[in-house]
Amino acid sequence: MRKRTRMDLCCALGAALVAAFVMTWATLTGAKAQTAETLQSLDDAWWTGPLVSYSARSLPQGHILIEPYFYDVSANRTDSIHSFTYFLYGATDRLTVGIAPDIAFTSAHGGADSSGVHLGDTTLRAQYMLTAMDPARGIPDLALAVLQNLPTGKYDRLGRTSDGFGGGSYATTLAIYSQMAWWMPSGRLLRTRFNLAETISPRVPVSDASVYGTDAGFLGHAQPGNRFSVNTAFEYSLTRNWVLALDLIYNHGSATTARGFHAAKSVHIESGDSDAFGFAPALEYNWTANFGALAGVRVFPAGHNTNASVTPALAINYVH
């Protein structure tokens, strides 16, 4: 009998969470319609948010959000363990700004591990809420966001390829987020999100071994491909404290190229376009309206020019 791997266990966990979500969906859609008096109130539902999608709701002015994520990307015979933390601040009731640094370590099966824990790239973000959700009038939360990548992670001149945790690019992401709450026939709330994002990356100077597949002695540049993503999410409020969540994800990446010279010879490396579809079931638990935890797994089957990956994740969400 084949030994069960971590990826097998994570896939089994993801399948179990998806099955729980589907069974709950079937139950709630088959329930009898409730009267207005028995509908769950918006204040009675506490949320941390799903695993992948961003919230369109801004923080109230003067409030802060701290949300550390801990996750392990298991793909292509490597495990990359990350700690990624959001620090967000409500500059006004409609404008939220923040920063999200990343630290990581890679364990390579059959290869060299990272030389230690390293800093990855850092993201600056600003988000402006255009409308505030009003379910009675059919108005969703709607926001525009700008994310700026700071290339704080090492990406070239690598002694070990497992030390590459950055991209070297000042990439800019433009996004639109929406969020809405719906009352299901069971009377419980279902919150949905829909995100669209486009990432544009400028050219990057590259020397020696790098995350772009170049070797020691290379001198040239890389052009990361632009990325487009679509994400929709569903959260069902089981009780005030417990929430089932599910993200559905599509990512498209344009070809990434590296051009330059190695040992006086011209070098051209191209990855080709890529497409990936994934899902991320999760379970939320909220101790209060401002403090909760989230556990789940993000699964990407192998796609067009993409490897299969399984990423178990845990997050703590605190608003003050």
What are these regions (language model features)?
Residues Y54-G62, R77, R94, A132-D141, ...:
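Short loop/turn motifs that connect adjacent beta-strands in outer-membrane beta-barrel proteins
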Residues R77-H82, S107-S114, K154-T161, R203-G213, ...:
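Outer-membrane beta-barrel translocator domains and adjoining extracellular loop/strand segments
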Residues I66, T85-Y89, L124-Y128, V146, ...:
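Residues on the lipid-exposed face of transmembrane beta-strands in outer-membrane beta-barrel proteins
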Residues P68-D72, I99-I103, L144-L150, T192-I200, ...:
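Transmembrane beta-barrel strands of outer-membrane/channel proteins
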Residues G217-H320:
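Outer membrane beta-barrel transmembrane domains
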Residues D79-T85, V117-L124, P140, G166-L174, ...:
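Residues that define the transmembrane beta-barrel architecture of outer-membrane proteins
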Residues D163, G167-A264:
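Detector for outer-membrane/organellar transmembrane beta-barrel domains
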Residues L28-P68, V73-S74, D134-D141:
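Outer-membrane beta-barrel biogenesis signature
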